[in-house]
A protein has these predicted regions:
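Alpha-helical/coil-rich non-catalytic "connector" segments in signaling and regulatory proteins
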Residues: 1-174
Length: 174
């Protein structure tokens, strides 16, 4: 599954305390799995995530569209990237291999979710099953409403009923 810089940023922020996002963010799901940036390379391919050390970045890079750099540390040249791509800064004393593995885990999590949804769809599952499979991704109560404003499925029904006061037994917003 392809992801976006915003998802990567928020999921990394859950694990690492010193993460900030700069440059072009975005919610379009265009980014492929990460790769390590190899020193001396001047070009960054479009729709790619690169995990790198900020002090190893080139001064005059060729940046494709929708590039996301996950940079460890700061460097004076880094501000030149902010107008041209998404930059997720990881400050502090983090191991580059650990950060790379965390990014891989984020992609694995979303790939697993996509696989679950396809399995449910292929085996004639229903919408409540899809909602249940999505709970770990959205991490909030969900309410699926049809075009006729009837409830098609809910998660955490007790929360919706007791905390938000929704009367789910009427099957609509009447």
């Amino acid at each position: 599954m392809k992801l976006c810089a915003d998802i990567l940023y928020w999921r990394l922020k859950e694990k690492l305390t010193t993460v900030t996002q700069r440059g072009k963010g975005g919610s379009a799901l265009t980014l492929n799995r990460p790769e390590f940036y190899l020193d001396r390379s001047q070009s960054f391919e479009k729709n790619r995530v690169y995990v790198c050390s900020a002090d190893h970045l080139p001064q005059s890079p060729k940046l494709g569209e929708n590039v996301c750099l996950i940079c460890l540390g700061q460097h004076w040249n880094l501000s030149a990237y902010y107008d041209r791509c998404s930059v997720i800064l990881v400050e502090g004393n983090w191991d580059i291999f650990r950060v790379f593995n965390l990014v891989q885990e984020i992609f694995n999590r979303y790939d697993s979710w996509e696989d679950q949804l396809w399995t449910i769809l292929r085996h004639g599952g229903n919408l409540p099953q899809m909602l249940e499979a999505s709970r770990g991704i959205f991490e909030n109560p969900m309410l699926l409403i049809g075009s006729d404003f009837r409830y098609l499925g809910v998660t955490e029904e007790d929360y919706l009923r007791n905390k938000l006061g929704l009367q789910l037994d009427t099957q609509s917003f009447d």
